[in-house]
C-alpha cells in the first residue's frame, strides 16, 4: 500500500486513486462567454462564472420615470447613480431617511437597513441605499416627508 506523509506525521493512502487519465473536455464557448440563459457576462478564458439575477427597476421621480436593470447584489441607489440617475441620499447606510421611497410594485430586500420600523416597511417604504431588488420593482422616490409625517 502506497502512503504519502502528510502534515503532523499522519499517513494518507492513495492506492484507491485512479492512475490513468480520464477523458474529459472543459471549454469556454463563445455563447457562454457572451451570455448564458439570458444573463449578461464578461467572461474571459479561465474566469469563474457566477450567475446572478438582474431585475428591472422603475423609479418614479418628481422629474419623471426612469427605468434600468439592476443586479440583485447591488443596492438600488448605487446602481441608479451608475446609470446617471440622481437620487437623494445622506448616510448611505440605512440609518436615516434621506433616500426614502415607496414600493408600489414588486419586492426588495432591505435587511441591511436599521432606520425603518416594521410598520413603515409593511406600508411599502424603502431606503434605496440599502435595498436590493428581489423582483422587478416600481419605486416612488423622494418620500422622506411622507415617511416622517
From Swiss-Prot:
Effect upon mutating residue 85 to L: In strain: cv. Onward
Q: Where is the transit peptide?
A: 1-52
- Provide the GO biological process annotations: electron transport chain
What GO terms are given for molecular function?
2 iron, 2 sulfur cluster binding; electron transfer activity; metal ion binding
Q: How is the cofactor bound?
A: Binds 1 [2Fe-2S] cluster.
* One Gene Ontology cellular component annotation held by this UniProt entry: chloroplast stroma
Result after altering residue 59 to I: In strain: cv. Onward
Q: Where in the cell is it found?
A: Plastid, Chloroplast
Cofactor(s) recorded for this entry are: [2Fe-2S] cluster
What keywords appear on the UniProt entry? 2Fe-2S, Chloroplast, Electron transport, Iron, Iron-sulfur, Metal-binding, Plastid, Transit peptide, Transport
Q: Could you tell me which residue ranges the 2Fe-2S ferredoxin-type domain spans? A: 55-145
Q: Where does [2Fe-2S] cluster bind?
A: 91, 96, 99, 129
Describe the function of this protein.
Ferredoxins are iron-sulfur proteins that transfer electrons in a wide variety of metabolic reactions.
Q: How does it assemble?
A: Forms a complex with heterodimeric ferredoxin-thioredoxin reductase (FTR) and thioredoxin.
> Family, per the entry?
Belongs to the 2Fe2S plant-type ferredoxin family.
* Name of this chain's protein: Ferredoxin-1, chloroplastic
Amino acid at each position: 500500500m502506497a502512503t504519502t506523509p502528510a502534515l503532523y506525521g499522519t499517513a494518507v493512502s492513495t492506492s484507491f486513486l485512479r492512475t490513468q487519465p480520464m477523458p474529459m473536455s472543459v471549454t469556454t464557448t463563445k455563447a457562454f462567454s457572451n451570455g448564458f440563459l439570458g444573463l449578461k457576462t464578461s467572461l474571459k478564458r479561465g474566469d469563474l462564472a457566477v450567475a446572478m439575477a438582474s431585475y428591472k427597476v422603475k423609479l418614479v421621480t418628481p422629474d419623471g420615470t426612469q427605468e434600468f436593470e439592476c443586479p440583485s447584489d447591488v443596492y438600488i441607489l448605487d446602481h441608479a447613480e451608475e446609470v446617471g440617475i440622481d437620487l437623494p441620499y445622506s448616510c448611505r447606510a440605512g440609518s436615516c431617511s434621506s433616500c426614502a421611497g415607496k414600493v408600489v410594485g414588486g419586492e426588495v430586500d432591505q435587511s441591511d437597513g436599521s432606520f425603518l420600523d416594521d410598520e413603515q416597511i409593511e406600508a411599502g417604504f424603502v431606503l434605496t441605499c440599502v435595498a436590493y431588488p428581489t423582483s422587478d420593482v416600481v419605486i416612488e422616490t423622494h418620500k422622506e416627508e411622507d415617511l416622517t409625517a
